[in-house]
């Protein structure tokens, strides 16, 4: 990370030179005289109530208490116009942030009573959806992800058209964040910015431990449904996805877990928070997501609200993230530490080679032979120019039926019947 940061300075210096060359002037923002006055009034009248609300550990109860204070403030300033009311609410948000940040920097317990380094209570379950090929329910505090894994044939890969041409994605991850998971209502629609971004992060975190497609030729789809969210649902998805893949029998090289780190900084004073809540993300300075295995990091993403952090903060954040990741992996390994065998109802696949001069015979005139094999067995049979045959069935029985027919074709007189497509 520090090496990359050092290398970036060359580009940053060039950008600064370009800015000076162009002569872009900074925007001048008029000083707001009213918001500081409202802040002083709210601090005097409502600080104790806000501070008390932020000692409530349960998110729903805490939100209700804070909303009660908000309504009381709006009632007090009900005679103000819309612009002034907005400034009052801005002062209220600033006061919320000041109270939470001051408490943490002074060494007081965090909102839910934890110290800086404690991970919330964990619950790990696998095989929770009987008809799914693999599934897991991962819960960390008030954040929960229900993750399902589905295995399919190579033909089911997602076809993508990019500037580089056509390509196929054999590993898909869909992250769903319904409104109800944060106690809201909303119209179910297509994926939004959050779902696309969090899904991509979770996908990057696992790609490094997936088997090569040549060794495990399945198309894999992961769906993560966030059923409850209070901080870092994307990292819950990382943990649940790793578990569901191993539950499905996907031979990962190592389990992967993720954690979100936060930061409260005031001048030279700072505190790094492990496993942040939603409020700590909202009121703090950083949301630093770190995912990886026992051996190292597989994905990083940092959202930051201040100008930057120094090496000391980065070092402490990564060190604390590693400790938390090891703790989570230990809990995950207690439930499932290595991939299971493929379930009996999981798709079955086998690859083998034949002589190239046999390819035409296996396909048959107009594809008659290979179509006949697929119709009789219910399996999918693919053959490429190198002579590699892939047989894929919804279950072991269908795959074996196709294999038996292929073997029979070239060891008995039944071959003529199949070649004619009868």
Model-derived regions, located:
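Extended amphipathic alpha-helical scaffolds
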Residues: 27-167, 347-361, 369, 376-377
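Glycine-rich, flexible beta-strand/loop modules in the N-terminal catalytic cores of phosphate-handling
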Residues: 128, 133-218, 296-306, 314-315
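Polar interaction faces of repeat-based domains
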Residues: 375-385, 408-409
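Short glycine/threonine-rich beta-strand-turn micro-motifs
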Residues: 385-395
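Flexible, glycine/charged-enriched surface loops at secondary-structure junctions
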Residues: 11-29, 60-61, 80-88, 105-116, ...
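Flexible hinge/switch segments at interdomain interfaces of large molecular machines
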Residues: 40-44, 174-181, 213-217, 291-296, ...
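Mobile "lid/hinge" segments at catalytic clefts and subdomain interfaces of large enzymes
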Residues: 1-45, 248-338
């Amino acid at each position: 990370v520090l090496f990359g940061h050092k290398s970036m300075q060359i580009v940053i210096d060039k950008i600064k030179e370009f800015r000076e060359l162009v002569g872009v002037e900074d925007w001048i923002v008029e000083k707001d005289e009213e918001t500081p006055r409202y802040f002083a009034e709210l601090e005097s009248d409502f600080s104790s109530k806000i501070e008390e609300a932020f000692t409530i550990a349960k998110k729903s109860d805490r939100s209700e208490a804070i909303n009660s204070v908000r309504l009381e403030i709006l009632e007090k300033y009900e005679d103000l116009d819309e612009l002034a009311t907005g400034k009052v609410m801005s002062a209220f948000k600033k006061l919320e942030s000041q109270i939470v940040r001051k408490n943490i920097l002074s060494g007081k317990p965090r909102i839910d009573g934890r110290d800086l380094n404690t991970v919330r209570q964990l619950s790990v379950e696998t095989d929770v959806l009987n008809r799914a090929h693999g599934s897991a329910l991962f819960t960390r505090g008030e954040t929960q992800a229900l993750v399902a894994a589905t295995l399919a044939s190579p033909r089911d890969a997602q076809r993508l058209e990019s500037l580089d041409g056509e390509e196929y994605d054999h590993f898909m991850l869909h992250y769903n964040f319904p409104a109800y998971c944060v106690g809201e209502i909303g119209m179910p629609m297509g994926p939004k910015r959050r779902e696309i971004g969090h899904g991509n992060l979770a996908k990057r975190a696992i790609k490094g431990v997936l088997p090569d497609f040549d060794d495990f030729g399945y198309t894999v789809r992961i769906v993560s449904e966030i059923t409850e969210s209070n901080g870092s649902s994307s990292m819950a998805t990382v943990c649940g996805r790793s578990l569901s893949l191993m539950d499905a029998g996907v031979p990962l090289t190592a389990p992967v877990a993720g954690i979100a780190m936060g930061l409260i900084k005031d001048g030279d004073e700072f505190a790094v928070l492990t496993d942040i809540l939603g409020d700590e993300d909202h009121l703090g300075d950083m949301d630093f997501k770190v995912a990886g295995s026992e051996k190292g990091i597989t994905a990083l993403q940092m959202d930051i609200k201040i100008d930057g952090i120094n090496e000391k903060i980065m070092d402490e954040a990564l060190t604390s993230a590693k400790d938390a990741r090891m703790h989570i992996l230990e809990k995950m390994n207690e439930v499932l530490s290595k991939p299971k065998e493929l379930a009996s109802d999981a798709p079955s696949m086998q690859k083998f080679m034949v002589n190239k001069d046999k390819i035409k015979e296996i396909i048959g005139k107009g594809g008659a032979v290979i179509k006949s094999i697929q119709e009789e067995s219910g399996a999918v049979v693919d053959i490429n120019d190198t002579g590699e045959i892939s047989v894929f069935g919804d279950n072991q029985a269908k795959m074996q039926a196709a294999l038996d027919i292929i073997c029979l074709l070239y060891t008995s007189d039944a071959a003529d019947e199949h070649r004619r497509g009868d």
